[in-house]
Curated annotation (Swiss-Prot):
Stated name of the protein: Translation initiation factor IF-2
Protein location: Cytoplasm
Cysteines engaged in disulfide bonds, as pairs: none
Gene name linked to the record: infB
GO terms of molecular function: GTP binding; GTPase activity; translation initiation factor activity
Length: 953
């Protein structure tokens, strides 16, 4: 909205700038001078107000200005008797206060009406200031006029008044004429004959009538005046409060300055006393020193004068300084040598016994009581710390029999002996290793006792193969996890969280196969409670005993869940008796272990099992501090083609947030994203919460600890340092040939080796597979793991296999198209598996030479899922298009997502449009269903293959 300046408004309406400024202030606008600007709406408001106020000027032919023309002019003439004063009052009025004018006019009208009565009412109405509703008042007054002749009387009265006023000034004659013409016009228009037209006639009363409007105007004027007084009182009270507050602030400031000045004066007095003491001490030393210096200068002066003078041929002696002497020494003994010094003419340079300037001495500093040192500190660093000269410390070391310079490093024993000589208690500084994240788990001061809260228990489910661990967890989570596991066994740790009775419980599902011993050990190390699953029909098995040993080693309580009690051959009592032999005694028998008989398949006694878990957790008093930086353990790690390194973490203390700088094992990074066990993104993870994170530089090892650092710089430094240490440790563990192991090395050359390269989907599977293959014992043959890593089989793996004559074993991963092509070219064998004991059996049979029939996998074709359709009571149908080869009805299929095999099974149905077909060829579309798998997604790759038996050469 545009703005206008006040002087422009004044020029537009023909008023002075001062009047416009005062009226703008009266309206409540924030203006200061004629140069101030106001909004367009406020400018229109000011112009309209002035136009209303100046309306009598426009109709000058009809009315007379009440205050500026008629009344003030008469008053001025009576008081001064001067025509010049009257003109001045009319032509140049003072600044107007509209509110005060309205109040004064209201009071004046009320007083005038009471004094003159009803006969002068019309004259006051015409002579007074026209209010906004004067027109309505005139109309109401016209109704009270009884006869048309009454208008004639009023007309004569107007003429008589005009004739009385006109001799005063020439302008007043013009006003009278206008009044008469206005009255005649009203008479002609019939404005005063309303009562006659209505046919009513009221008798004219001589007694004065009560003017209620005048009373109301007077009352309103009094109310306005009272409001003005109250506003002014409030304004003054506010100003007084502000003044008192400012005065209080000034007093507080002066008090603070006064206290500061007093403190400074005390300090100055103390410093002055110290300086006086030092001056007295120095004066005694200076006086003795100056006496000795003067005595030496008097003895040396005659020789110096002879050097500075020479004799001319006339025998006249002149003073001359030896400026050309390049060997002159400029020191204290020759301090009078000054090139710019001017001497008096004809006089020899003589020594003046002036007192030398006082030599500033080093201030005395007290020795510290304690000295914290580090190994390898230099003499200069020690001198700076204890505020002594390095030369003094070098001298002390020399007296102690140690030859050292100020830049030489000292060992801890020498530093302690030196501090003993000074009388200082020496302490070795304990340096905190920034790269050591294990200290967060061991340091009790890391947690804040006042912030300790109860946390959810971490429960690990252990047991033998196919005893129902994943089925139990599946029942708890109400999902079908077991159907997605190849071979019906769990391949790697899954971490899940459920809620029971308002409390959360975190479950870790560890594999039960013998190859996954290290994974079970890791699960036991981070758990709070162990649920030992034992099948009621099988009893105690080897992995059951191993799980018992892991739990006892970790010192965690054990809850025994006897599963499969719904089977006909179930015998829970036999299981209790067998477990008692290994120290697992039921509370019914006087032991400490809780036993619960369940059926995970039919959801029997599951609630009782969860109640037992919460009861044991309450007894254990599991606590955590969610306010500190997060620390915890890596449950699993894998390499994703699109996201990079993905690690499943279990937060044990603190709260993990997105964008936290983190060190995980020997790598570091920043948490870019966190996903919980339900696949939802979260911004934070509290204690006992499992999450998967991305953002790490490399894939960590399962079982590594992690810690959150204060900033990314510290995390980077710690991660790089840990990586260097791990590499150095690996190099140190490399065995070199010596005389002691020379015979063993030569003997090992006679043993044939089978070189393998292992690639798996997760780190835990890599470790388990490598450990299982190395443990295979066949006489004369051993397995050598050349390389093991997480991720898809790539070209570098094929190149390494060719160079080392190795076999590539892929576990739940697939080779890239380039790697497959290179393997065919270089004749490198790639074995792909999804069940770990199948790999072990195959390698073992190959080592023993018992592979009679050899089955070779033949790829029939590949297809891409373009659309999925979910049909109730049937499953998921995948609409696909063949991009290579063909897909047959009797072929096996693999579902590949991001180069990782997520399912391997048989086709349940194959259709081309609505017809069942035996095969779908290249570039054709069709629909398929896979047995026991409904998690098809768009862009999944379907690989069709068959197993062909080949004759071994």
């Amino acid at each position: 909205m545009s703005k206008k300046r006040l002087h422009e408004i004044a020029k537009e309406i023909g008023k002075s700038s001062k009047e416009v400024v005062e009226y703008a202030k009266y309206l409540g606008l924030d203006v200061k001078s004629h140069a101030s600007s106001v909004e367009e709406a406020d400018a229109k408001k000011i112009i309209s107000s002035f136009s209303k106020a100046s309306k009598p000027d426009v109709t000058a032919s009809q009315t007379v200005k009440p205050k500026e023309v008629a009344q003030p002019s008469v008053t001025v003439v009576k008081e001064t008797g001067s025509e010049h004063v009257e003109k001045t009052q009319v032509s140049k009025p003072k600044s107007r206060n509209f509110k005060a004018e309205r109040e004064a006019r209201a009071k004046e009208q009320a007083a005038r009406k009471q004094a003159n009565g009803s006969s002068h009412r019309s004259q006051e109405r015409r002579g007074g200031y026209r209010q906004p509703n004067n027109h309505q008042t005139n109309e109401q007054g016209n109704k009270r006029i009884t006869h048309r002749s009454q208008g004639d009387t009023n007309d004569k009265r107007i003429e008589r008044k005009a004739s009385n006023v006109s001799p005063r000034h020439d302008n007043h004659q013009l006003v009278g004429d206008r009044n008469r013409s206005f009255a005649k016009e009203n008479h002609k228009n019939g404005r005063f004959t309303n009562q006659k037209k209505q046919g009513r006639q009221e008798p004219q009363s001589k007694s004065p009538k009560i003017d209620f409007k005048a009373r109301a105007a007077a009352l309103k004027a009094e109310q306005n005046a009272e409001y003005s007084r109250q506003s002014e009182t409030r304004f003054r009270a506010q100003q007084e409060a502000k003044r008192l507050a400012e005065l209080a602030r000034q007093e507080a400031k002066e008090a603070a300055l006064k206290a500061q000045a007093e403190e400074m004066s005390h300090r100055e007095a103390a410093l002055k006393s110290i300086e006086e003491a030092e001056t007295k001490l120095k004066s005694s030393n200076i006086s003795a020193k100056s006496t000795a210096d003067n005595r030496r200068k008097k003895q040396a002066r005659p020789e110096k004068n002879r050097e500075l003078t020479h004799h001319s041929q006339e025998g006249q002696k002149k003073n001359k300084k030896s400026w050309n002497s390049q060997n002159q020494v400029r020191n204290q003994k020759n301090s009078n040598w000054n090139k710019n010094k001017k001497t008096k003419k004809g006089k020899n340079v003589k020594n003046t016994n002036t007192a030398p300037k006082p030599v500033t001495e080093r201030k005395f500093h007290e020795l510290p009581k304690e000295f914290e040192y580090t190994e390898g500190m230099t003499v200069a660093e020690i001198a700076k710390r204890i505020k002594r000269e390095p030369a003094e410390i070098v001298k002390k070391l020399f007296m102690m029999g140690v030859m050292a310079t100020q830049n030489q490093s000292l060992d801890g024993d020498t530093i302690e002996l030196l501090m003993v000589d000074y009388g200082i208690e020496a302490k070795a500084k304990v340096e905190v290793d920034n790269a050591d994240i294990e200290r967060f788990f061991e340091d009790e001061n890391y947690l804040n006792p006042e912030n300790i809260v109860e946390r959810a228990p971490v429960v690990t489910i252990m047991g033998h193969v196919d005893h129902g661990k994943t089925t139990l967890l599946d029942t708890l989570r109400n999902s079908r996890v077991a159907t997605g596991e190849a071979g019906g066994i769990t391949q790697h740790i899954g971490a899940y969280q459920i809620e029971e009775a308002g409390k959360k419980i975190t479950f870790l599902d560890t594999p039960g196969h013998a190859a996954f011993t290290s994974m079970r050990a890791r699960g036991a190390s981070v758990t709070d409670i162990t649920i030992l699953i034992v099948a009621a029909d099988d009893g105690v098995m080897p992995q059951t005993i191993e799980a018992i040993n892991h739990s006892k080693a970790a010192g965690v309580p054990i809850i025994v869940a006897i599963n499969k009690i719904d089977k006909p051959g179930a015998n829970p009592e036999r299981v209790i008796a067998e477990l008692a032999e290994y120290g697992i005694i039921s509370t019914a028998w006087g032991g400490e272990c809780e036993f619960v008989e369940i059926s995970a398949k039919f959801n029997k006694n599951i609630d009782e099992l969860l109640e037992t878990v919460l009861l044991v957790a309450e007894v254990e008093e599991l606590k955590a501090d969610p306010t500190v930086r997060a620390i915890g353990t890596v449950i699993e790690a894998r390499l994703d083609k699109g996201k990079g390194a993905i690690a499943t973490l279990l937060v044990q203390q603190g709260t993990l947030h997105v964008q936290d700088p983190i060190v995980v094992g020997n790598t570091f990074g920043r948490v870019r994203a966190m996903v919980n066990d339900l696949g939802r993104r979260v911004k934070s993870a509290e204690p006992s919460t499992p999450v998967s994170i991305t953002g790490l530089n490399e894939t960590p090892m399962a079982g590594d600890h992690f810690a959150v650092y204060a900033d990314e710089k510290a995390a980077r430094a710690a991660g790089e340092e840990r990586s260097k240490r791990a590499l150095l440790k690996q190099r140190q563990n490399t065995q070199r040939v010596s005389l002691d192991n020379l015979f063993d090395t030569l003997k090992a050359g006679e043993i044939k080796t089978v070189n393998v390269i292992i690639k798996a989907d997760v780190q835990g599977s890599v470790e388990a597979l490598a450990a299982s293959l190395v443990k295979i014992e066949v006489e004369g043959v051993r397995v050598n793991v050349v390389h093991s890593a997480v991720g898809a089989i790539n070209e570098s793996d094929v190149t390494l296999a060719e160079a080392s004559n190795a076999v590539i074993i892929g576990f739940n991963v697939r080779p890239t198209p380039q790697a497959r092509q290179q393997a065919d070219t270089d004749d490198v064998e790639i074995r792909l598996h999804s069940i770990i004991y199948k790999v072990i059996e195959e390698v073992e049979e190959a080592m023993k030479g018992k592979l009679d029939p050899v089955y070779q996998e033949k790829i029939l074709g590949e297809a891409i899922i373009r659309e999925t359709f979910k049909v109730s009571k049937v499953g998921t149908i995948g609409g696909f298009m063949v991009i290579n080869g063909k897909v047959t009805r009797d072929s096996s299929v693999r579902v590949i997502r991001d180069s990782v095999v997520i399912f391997d099974g048989k086709l349940a149905s194959l259709k081309h449009y609505k017809d069942d077909v035996k095969e779908v060829g290249n570039a054709q579309e069709g629909g398929l269903m896979i047995e026991n798998f409904n998690d098809l997604k768009v862009d999944d790759t379907i690989e069709a293959y068959i197993m062909e038996e080949i004759v071994r050469k």
